[in-house]
Amino acid sequence: MQHGRITRGFYFEDLPLGTTWLSQGRTLTESDLGTYVNLTWFTEDLFTDQHNRTGNAIGGRPVPALMVMAFSEGLVLHSMDRTGLAFLNVDMDVKSPIYVGDTIYVHCEVIESRATSKPGRGLVRTRNTVTNQHGETVLVYQPLRLYKSREGKTDATSTS
């Protein structure tokens, strides 16, 4: 099953294995970087000193991978609107540097979906592939979330 733009949160039953969707894009700005670095005290020279970044042979103004993941989560938030119950776990793999000025998109695919022993909820793991404006994969993360089921029913038709 493939979904376009998301206008409401998915219920557990909406997310069988193989379901995919794509987020809108988000351009990462200098202001975003400054706000994130100051808010989190992520004061590494690589992110705070534009002119004296030691050992920076990558070019461009890099953005912390955790900031990219946080912004990516914001982009997929609509898929959990009023149906997401908990963020339980995540595995993350940074594939490429991300820079100020890059636009990110999140491609989501359900890779695990199973009912829980408690009625009214189910566990869903997605593979979230973050790409830049050139279609290059920059980050892949696999969050495990707890979703509501419709009308409190649990249907164990999906498996991992």
Predicted regions and their residues:
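Short, intrinsically disordered/low-complexity patches at protein termini
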Residues: D45-F47, A86-F87, M92-D93, L123-V124, ...
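HotDog/MaoC-like acyl-thioester-processing domains
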Residues: M1-L17, I98-S160
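Mid-chain, well-packed structural core segment of small domains
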Residues: D81-V100, V106
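Hot-dog-fold acyl-thioester-processing enzymes
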Residues: M1-N89, R150-S160
